[in-house]
Amino acid sequence: ISFGGYIIYDLAQSLFPDKKIVLKELPIYNILKDNYYSGTNYVFINAYFSPDRLDTDYLLNYVAEGNNVFISAFGIYGDLADSLRIKTYDMFFSEVSVNINFNLPELKSENGYSYFRGNFENYFSEYDTLLVQVLGRSEEKNVNFLRIKYGQGNFFLNTVPLAFTNYH
């Protein structure tokens, strides 16, 4: 589990006690190729996310059929980024804190959420404003969390994977 993400895995089980939480460590294609999923969520928390064309096609079809994908990574690249028309910008701050917040009033914190030491100020430098709902921004107002409606489902993309770990 990336970045000590076992905490979010454990929390998911208590937050969704009536739901099945499954940890998979296989390539996307191997998981989705022979199965039909409906109303499910697929979560990725990685340093960088760059699936190949085959995995991208399976992921796009999975979401188009009404499922959701949450990806939190410093950068999202390759075929998936091209298909969703997004680009990420990477910047590393070794001694500076990063402050992030949500856009939605019901989730927004007055002071935001701060992460210290060894931080990345990564954000979406390009996205299609007609397709995207901005969900979060950095203290510098850079977009770091967004939702893209795709078919019957959604992609939730985030550039602060350390926020979902026990790293800080």
Task: Annotate each language-model stretch with its function.
Residues 10, 20-103, 145:
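Membrane-embedded segments
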Residues 1-13:
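Alpha-helical transmembrane signal-anchor/signal-peptide segments
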Residues 4, 51-54, 167-168:
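Extracytoplasmic/periplasmic, Sec-exported soluble proteins
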Residues 4, 66, 151-153:
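Glycine-centered flexibility sites
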Residues 2, 22, 48-50, 112-115, ...:
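A short linear-motif detector with a strong N-terminal bias
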Residues 100-159, 163-167:
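Catalytic beta-strand/loop cores that center a nucleophilic Ser/Cys/Thr
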Residues 2-5, 30-33, 116-122:
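A broad, low-specificity signal for short, low-complexity segments enriched in glycine/proline
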